[in-house]
UniProtKB/Swiss-Prot annotation:
Protein name, entry field: Large ribosomal subunit protein uL15
Family: Belongs to the universal ribosomal protein uL15 family.
A single BP term in Gene Ontology: translation
InterPro entries xref list: Ribosomal_uL15 (IPR030878), Ribosomal_uL15/eL18 (IPR021131), Ribosomal_uL15/eL18_sf (IPR036227), Ribosomal_uL15_bac-type (IPR005749), Ribosomal_uL15_CS (IPR001196)
Entry-linked SUPFAM superfamilies: Ribosomal proteins L15p and L18e
Residue segments, region Disordered: 1-51
Feature: compositional bias, Gly residues: 21-31, 42-51
Cellular component, GO annotation: cytosolic large ribosomal subunit
Annotated Pfam families: Ribosomal_L27A
High-level lineage: Bacteria, Bacillati, Bacillota, Bacilli, Bacillales
GO molecular function: rRNA binding; structural constituent of ribosome
Length: 146
């Protein structure tokens, strides 16, 4: 094999379609835009959600709900991710942040019971699901709500 014999894998390179370059190309003359009309013009086309003058869906449906300004957003950590820590480790939100398990704290950490924990850990967090609490204690660990 020589350098000049190298070829890209089949289908990995696609030649870009140059429109408006003659009839033979299959995309000449109107360049795939059809004849006249709003969509044939430069800058033409309808805005997002426009339905041709008909009352659009988002206005036909009633308003619903509100945004709770006091909503707390917890960073979720599953039990399966706690297995990366050594036996007997005290797992705190600061440690989770340090080790890169979570990227930011938000309003606190909530431990959920997805997966299983096989190690005896002391877990400190802001919230626990009841099944996560049981699983940690069943593995011989302890739970502390901050």
């Amino acid at each position: 094999m020589k350098l000049h014999e190298l070829k890209p894998a089949e289908g990995s390179r696609k030649v870009r379609n140059r429109v408006g370059r003659g009839i033979g190309s299959g995309n000449g003359k109107t360049a795939g835009r059809g004849h006249k009309g709003q969509n044939a013009r430069s800058g033409g086309g309808v805005r997002l959600g426009f339905e041709g003058g008909q009352t659009p869906l988002f206005r036909r449906l009633p308003k619903r709900g509100f945004t709770n300004i006091n909503r707390k957003e917890f960073t979720i950590v599953n039990l399966s991710t706690l297995n990366r820590f050594e036996d007997g480790t005290e797992v705190t939100p600061e440690l989770l942040l340090e080790t890169g398990v979570i990227s930011k704290l938000n309003d606190g950490v909530k431990i959920l019971a997805s997966g299983a924990v096989e190690k005896k850990l002391t877990v400190k967090a802001h919230k626990f699901s009841s099944s996560a609490k049981e699983a940690i204690e069943a593995a011989g660990g302890s739970v502390e709500v901050i």
